Amino acid sequence: MWGMAYKMDEAGEQRLRGFFEAIGGCLRDKRQRASFALYALGILGEGERKSCEPIAARACGDPAQMDNVHNQLLHFLRSSPWDNRLVRLVAAKYAIEALNEQEPVMNWVLDDTGFLKQGTHSVGVQRQYTGSAGKTANCQIGVSLSVATRTAHLPIDFELYLPRSWIDDPARRTEAKIPADVTFQTKIDLALRMVERAVAAGIPGEVVLADSAYGESYLFRETLRLLGLDYALGIHAPTKVWLVDAAGSQQGKPISVGKLAEQLGPKAFRRIPMVA
């Protein structure tokens, strides 16, 4: 395909074609569909560098055509009108169907990931803490929503976190072509928007999982509750909660979860084995 080498059997190639056909329904013309297929193959295929220029170079048997293919990819990613969220949703449903053939999707997992950078021009980059590096570093941060079975997980939605240093800088916004309607949103805000989209789309899942960066947020926990979602979230021992009765009414004064755990005693807890 496209002059690029792939280690793929016939069944794999058929699945790949089925995936491209599903995504093709979201794209308006043959040129967009061809550009999407070329870019996706470049990301999935061999070669360490995954930007447009090396993808174009690997795809072209004739070096004279490389500039044309490179420009085609740039136009598709930067200027060509297509709904990236719709593409992501169709891709997610396609992949979830494949996961469910092996075992059911049980959980949603929210997390953020840092992408280390050298310069200052990548959209959203600044010195900020990232758990990926375990320190403050020059990086972009993306918030992701993944679905998970007992043995596999798959990211289905993603939002780039834009710090105020980008949102409040008109020159940076113009250069990066950040849409005028994009306002500052915290990582919690981004995570909740993805959850709301997943609920609206009917994505399967039983329990929302996240670490304390999200679990410490009352807004996050309360929004999940209002959406009717069960959750298991990381929180810190000093975090205070209210005990409630069967009717949901608060009882007494708030208590830290650390003290509550001590009062419950060891018999109230059990270990849940992790599946490798």
Where are these regions (language model features)?
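Short linear interaction motifs
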Residues: 34-38, 126-127
